[in-house]
């Protein structure tokens, strides 16, 4: 699956990047959460070919909120705005 980066270039999707970013947000809020929970959330995300980085970030925030991790979604959103 191809992802459209901020500069418009295409890159092969790497789910590990999402896991890493979510892990950082969890560490800021809930360090007791484990990587298996995060990996399961990423597996549940509905992504599509040609998705943009911004759309992926929106899906991440929505998924975190769906799982009841509002604090983590806020931390991720803050991390996102710093990028």
Predicted stretch roles:
Residues 1-83:
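Long, C-terminal-biased catalytic regions of enzyme "large/alpha" subunits
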């Amino acid at each position: 699956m191809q992802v459209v980066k901020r500069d418009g270039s295409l890159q092969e999707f790497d789910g590990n990047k999402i896991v890493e970013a979510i892990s950082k947000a969890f560490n800021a809020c809930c360090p007791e959460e484990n990587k298996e929970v995060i990996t399961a959330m990423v597996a549940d995300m509905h992504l599509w070919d040609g998705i943009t980085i911004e759309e992926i970030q929106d899906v991440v925030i929505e998924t975190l909120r769906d799982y009841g991790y509002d604090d983590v979604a806020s931390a991720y959103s803050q991390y996102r705005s710093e990028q």
